[in-house]
Amino acid sequence: MSARAGIIVTGTEVLTGRVQDRNGPWIADRLLELGVELAHITICGDRPADIEAQLRFLAAEGVDLIVTSGGLGPTADDLTVATVARFCGRELILDTELEQRIADILRRLMGRRTDVDFDALRAANRKQAMVPDGATVLEPVGTAPGVVVPGSPTVLVLPGPPRELQPMWRTAVQTEALRSAIAGRTEYRQDMVRMFGLPESGLAETLRDAERDLAGFDRLEITTCLRRGELEIVTRYEPDAEPVYRNLLTLLRDRHGSAIFSEDGSLVDDQVAALLAGHTIATAESCTGGMLSARLTERAGSSAYVAGAAVCYADAAKVELLGVPADLIADHGAVSEPVAEAMADGALRRFGADVAVAITGIAGPGGGTELKPVGTVCFCVRRADGRVVTRTVRLPGDRSDVRERSTTVAMHLLRRALQDG
């Protein structure tokens, strides 16, 4: 049986939704990489009683390792270390060497500021140097150190800011206390297949057939997720079950080969970036308001291939900035394939790009008609050599869903156009 772990994300700001939890999913992925089975992720506020209740719950579940995030700062509500010490039956002691290292960090952070009472600041941060007796101290990335408290279960206490937590994790997994806690781990492999254009019901039917027909199917742990209009199929298995996974992959290829765009977990964004090497792209957007160009420029190095973008929401902007004929809009409507094609052609010329993508649609909640209901979106991908692809789709969901899914459709149309050479 594999080692099991639980995660406690602390912080009232996370519990109430003011701050999105980024640590829980990140730690979950790292545990998976280590071959540790994740039993629970819990979120609680800053009250010590609530934190201790979560610790006791996970201990009762029989986990070997508990990972906490948050509550390591110098303020009054940062009480995770003290709570963990009490839970583990350990006395808090002042680590004078750690206190000095924290003071050195504070001195560097303050620099030449003369308006700060350094002694008062140091005193306020002294609580960060109080650690459970017998714990392994993890060097601070900011000012807050982490600790590993050995026991049954072992508790790893990490800071809340991801920029501090993630580097500290790499140190934590090298400690003897943590490695001992997960010594019974089972090595797993994980593979991800991504699909686009296949409804969840179609995949569900295939997986039901696989469960019935594939020998050893029960050795695969499969999770599916619909994200940005794409299907993600994540399969986790022990190494000797690889032939079973290969048989599943063959079945997926046979039934849904045209929908599969990634078998190695790569995103369509990664693929488009690679395909644009040596080329330049321009975008012309209406209903998405620049979301496609934002997505294209999320990746470092995108300046090598993104030539420019035009957001033309009003019809007049389409005419003035992209040269879309006014009579074309009058004859076909702003949401039409002819107008999308003219927008792409205008972007291609204005920015001197090799390829252009245009989006025009009705995101809602108003503006729809019987012929063009809310969710109707028209796309065009035009190449400088004259090749062109146009498409009209009707996307489900609210305004936000339609806009986000529109960018995904555009990325896949672009991917296919670039793959065709």
UniProtKB/Swiss-Prot annotation:
Annotated disulfide bonds: none
InterPro entries named among the record's database cross-references: CinA, CinA-like_C, CinA_C, Competence-induced_CinA, MoaB/Mog-like_dom_sf, MoaB/Mog_dom
Name of a matching Pfam family: MoCF_biosynth
Coiled coil: none
PANTHER family found in the cross-reference section: NICOTINAMIDE-NUCLEOTIDE AMIDOHYDROLASE PNCC, NMN AMIDOHYDROLASE-LIKE PROTEIN YFAY
Family: Belongs to the CinA family.
Protein name per the record: CinA-like protein
Source organism (scientific name): Mycobacterium sp. (strain JLS)
